[in-house]
Swiss-Prot record:
Keywords in alphabetical order: Hydrolase
Disulfide partners: none
Species whose genome carries this gene: Pseudomonas aeruginosa (strain UCBPP-PA14)
Domain of life of the source: Bacteria
This protein's name: GTP cyclohydrolase FolE2
Family of this protein: Belongs to the GTP cyclohydrolase IV family.
HAMAP family, sorted: GTP_cyclohydrol_B
InterPro entries: GTP_cyclohydrolase_FolE2, GTP_cyclohydrolase_FolE2/MptA
Gene Ontology terms: biological process: tetrahydrofolate biosynthetic process
Keyword Hydrolase attributed: yes
Chain's gene name: folE2
GO molecular function, one term: GTP cyclohydrolase I activity
Pathway given in the UniProt record: Cofactor biosynthesis; 7,8-dihydroneopterin triphosphate biosynthesis; 7,8-dihydroneopterin triphosphate from GTP: step 1/1
One Pfam family linked to the record: GCHY-1
Amino acid sequence: MNALTLPDIARQTTTADLPLDWVGMQGIALPVQIGGQRVAAEADAGVSLDDPQARGIHMSRLYLALAELEQGELDLSRLRAVLQRFLDSHAGLSRRAYLRLRLAPLLRRPALVSPLSGWKRYPLVLDTRLEGDDFQAEVHLELTYSSTCPCSAALARQLIQERFDQDFAGQPLDHASVLAWLGSSAGIVATPHSQRSSAHLRIGLAEDCIGLPLEELADLGESALGTAVQTAVKRADEQAFALANGQNLMFCEDAVRRLHRALQGYPQASRFSIRVVHAESLHAHDAVAESHWQRGAA
């Protein structure tokens, strides 16, 4: 009995005569290595279908090419090599290749004062594409931080002044009594409102960038904001965090400008967009600000 040749329907032609921008798969489970740790990722992989008469692409070839990402540290050269394999396996069919990775690596972050440290998750998306020799890579990174409202802080200070005036009206002031008053609940009669906030960074990486600068970008953004959310803390760390919030009062406009200035000076960024969201504790809605920049643009 002769063995039958398995049919390959993707090789058939179509009468539709229409090229397609993107064909592929999304949500592919994949382990990758970043920063020396194994991380679960999801991949979206695809190519353009430029032959208008080709019925489809060979999705299994894309899937198998992704195995290269398991072989070592994830970097831009490895991502580019995978995209090139996408195109090589679709010669005559495709001119553009795309790959998106979604992952949430962990970074160990130190406490502000004490020797404690803990792990913090950084949601990350890597978008890459290749067309000819044109390789583009973009990092989407989310940072969380605390934002204390400058207006609320001013109103709280005014209430403290008024209470001080009431409690000490007509009395001679001495250092000990004022110090005791400032440390009492009667003295700090009001506090400003603050909230957990998020910054969504989309950064186009320069052509000469090789590695994935996750920790660099996280450090850069958190340093600019000054109030990154913490992991393990003692009371001394919590006090230092309260001080950081008091010294870094921020509207959403302030936060996005801080990040803009920091990223503008980052040499590996060719372009970026920033969106900050302050999940208001005073209001039932969010305060949002955005900024965009491209190197060399007027």
